[in-house]
């Protein structure tokens, strides 16, 4: 059912997350009445609608580590990891001295670029076939979740103790924002279906493996 959030009997209360943001809320229905015309699809076919919504959500979530779906579709996948890291680690001739960190940044950026091209290709194929997102979105969502978490892990590694702040004058606004966003990335492998659920979907609906 499509429900008017401003109608009588519907109340929402924000849920503040550890990141400090409130993208989620509790919704309370008290004697709320919704007209039958607001029914989406057919009666008792809500799961069909929900599954399609989940596929769209997973496609959107897949690109979050690339700066969002618009940035990914345009190939703008620069992570800014090198620029950020140079503020905190030893640099010689404009190159990060720590070879291990350099390799992590290079791998993350290359993976991001390859992933963005894959998302773009899949999006174009979906448009040309006149079909919506397929079960393959579970692959994108699974990888996108892990990629985003890895990216912020590298940021905190480069920042050292400056990446451990929660509040206080010794930490800058950008540092505090990155730390909170790092905490937020832990939810990436939960929202839109957990990584374990995605692996099940991939095995059954993409790879057609026996149960």
Regions found by a protein language model. Give the residues of each.
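Alpha-helical interface subdomain recognition
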Residues: 55-211
């Amino acid at each position: 059912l499509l429900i008017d959030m401003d109608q009588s009997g519907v109340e929402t209360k924000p849920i503040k997350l550890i990141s400090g943001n409130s993208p989620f809320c509790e919704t309370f229905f008290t004697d709320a009445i919704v007209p039958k015309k607001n029914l989406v699809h057919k009666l008792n076919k809500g799961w069909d609608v929900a599954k399609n919504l989940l596929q769209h959500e997973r496609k959107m979530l897949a690109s979050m580590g690339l700066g969002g779906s618009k940035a990914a579709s345009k190939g703008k996948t620069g992570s800014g990891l090198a620029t950020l890291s140079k503020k905190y680690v030893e640099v010689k001739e404009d190159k990060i001295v720590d070879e291990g960190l350099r390799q992590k940044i290079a791998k993350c950026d290359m993976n991001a670029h390859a992933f963005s091209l894959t998302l773009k290709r899949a999006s174009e194929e979906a448009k040309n076939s006149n079909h919506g997102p397929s079960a393959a979105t579970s692959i994108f969502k699974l990888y996108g979740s892990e990629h985003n978490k890895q990216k912020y892990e590298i940021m905190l590694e480069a920042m050292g103790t400056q990446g451990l702040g929660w509040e206080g004058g010794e930490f800058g606004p950008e540092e505090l924002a990155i730390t909170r966003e790092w905490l937020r990335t832990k939810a990436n492998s939960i929202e839109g279906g957990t990584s374990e659920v995605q692996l099940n979907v991939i095995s059954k609906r993409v790879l057609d493996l026996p149960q």
